[in-house]
Amino acid sequence: MTIALGKFTKDEKDLFDIMDDWLRRDRFVFVGWSGLLLFPCAYFALGGWFTGTTFVTSWYTHGLASSYLEGCNFLTAAVSTPANSLSHSLLLLWGPEAQGDFTRWCQLGGLWTFVALHGAFGLIGFMLRQFELARSVQLRPYNAIAFSGPIAVFVSVFLIYPLGQSGWFFAPSFGVAAIFRFILFFQGFHNWTLNPFHMMGVAGVLGAALLCAIHGATVENTLFEDGDGANTFRAFNPTQAEETYSMVTANRFWSQIFGVAFSNKRWLHFFMLFVPVTGLWMSALGVVGLALNLRAYDFVSQEIRAAEDPEFETFYTKNILLNEGIRAWMAAQDQPHENLIFPEEVLPRGNAL
C-alpha cells in the first residue's frame, strides 16, 4: 500500500485568512490580532482620562475639585474613584446607578472604572502585541515577559487592592497629586515602607537604574574608534555588521574595579531583565497582601519599651507614631462621608515631643 504525504492547501481563503492577511500585513504601524484589543482599549482609556481631567468634578465622590474646568492644573487634576457607598459596582453607563444618564454617570465616578478596566486590557493588549510581533519575526518573547511587570503592578494597585477593601473608593485616582495621596495612605494605614515586598521592589527598580547607567557608560567607554566624527552618533555607521564595543575590555575593567565582572553578554543582559521585573512582581505581590490587610514587620518589643520608658525611642517607634498621625489626620480629610472627629488629646505624641 502506498501512502502519499503532501501539504494540504485550501482552494480559497476563508474569512479568518482574509482577516489574518489584513491584520498582519507589513505596514508602518503594525496592527495584528492583538491590535483588536490594544487600540480600542488604549483609545477609550486615554480618552476617558482626558475627558475626566478636563470636565468632571469629584465633588460628589470625594468633595474635591479635580478638573481643569474647576481651576486644577496638570498636577492636581484627576479622574477620581467612585464614592465608598458604591462599593465594587462596575458602574456601567446603562447600569442601575446611572441609568443611561451620562452626566450622572460622570458624577458618580463611572469614568474611573471605565479608565481602569480599559487601561488594564490596553496594557494586556500591548503585551500580546509584543508576543505577536516576536513570533512573526522569530524572536524570543522576553520583551513581553518584561512588560508583565508593569501590568502586575497596575492590576494589583488599581484593581486587586480595592477589591480587597470596601470599594473602588480606596484605589488611587488617576492623577499626579492623587497618586501622592494614595502613597501617603499606604504608608499611614499599611506601613508600606517597612514591608519586605516594597523593599524588594525598590531594590529592583533602583538596582535596574544602576545597572542601566553602568551598562550604558561601559559600552560608551569601550567603543571602537571607528570614525573621526565629533561624537558617538556621527562617528559610527548604524548599518555596520561588526560589533562596536569590546566586551573583553569591559570585563577587564570591571574585574579590576569590583573583583568580579559579567563574563558574557547573555548573562549580563538577562540580569538586567531579571532585576527590575522581579522587583515589580514582588511589589505587586506585596500590594495583593495589603489588599487582604496582611501586616509586615511589627517590632512590638520596641513599641512596649517606648511606651514604658520616656527616654527610649527608635526610628521605628517614631515612624509608628507618624503613621498614627497620618491616620488620625487623613481619615477625617480623606473619608468625609464617615464624619470622623479626632480631638487633639487623642492625636499621637512621641516621647521626644
Curated annotation (Swiss-Prot):
Cellular localization per UniProt: Plastid, Chloroplast thylakoid membrane
Top-level class of the enzyme under EC nomenclature: oxidoreductase
PROSITE patterns per UniProt: REACTION_CENTER
Gene Ontology annotations for the cellular component aspect, listed alphabetically: chloroplast thylakoid membrane; photosystem II
Residues passing through the membrane, by range: 41-61, 125-141, 153-166, 208-228, 279-295
Family annotation (InterPro entries): D1/D2, Photo_II_D1/D2_sf, Photo_RC_L/M, Photo_RC_L/M_CS, PSII_PsbD/D2
Keyword Plastid set for record: yes
Record's keyword annotation contains Transferase: no
Co-factor: note: The D1/D2 heterodimer binds P680, chlorophylls that are the primary electron donor of PSII, and subsequent electron acceptors. It shares a non-heme iron and each subunit binds pheophytin, quinone, additional chlorophylls, carotenoids and lipids. There is also a Cl(-1) ion associated with D1 and D2, which is required for oxygen evolution. The PSII complex binds additional chlorophylls, carotenoids and specific lipids.
Extra remark: 2 of the reaction center chlorophylls (ChlD1 and ChlD2) are entirely coordinated by water.
Family per similarity comment: Belongs to the reaction center PufL/M/PsbA/D family.
Subunit and partners: PSII is composed of 1 copy each of membrane proteins PsbA, PsbB, PsbC, PsbD, PsbE, PsbF, PsbH, PsbI, PsbJ, PsbK, PsbL, PsbM, PsbT, PsbX, PsbY, PsbZ, Psb30/Ycf12, at least 3 peripheral proteins of the oxygen-evolving complex and a large number of cofactors. It forms dimeric complexes.
Protein name as catalogued: Photosystem II D2 protein
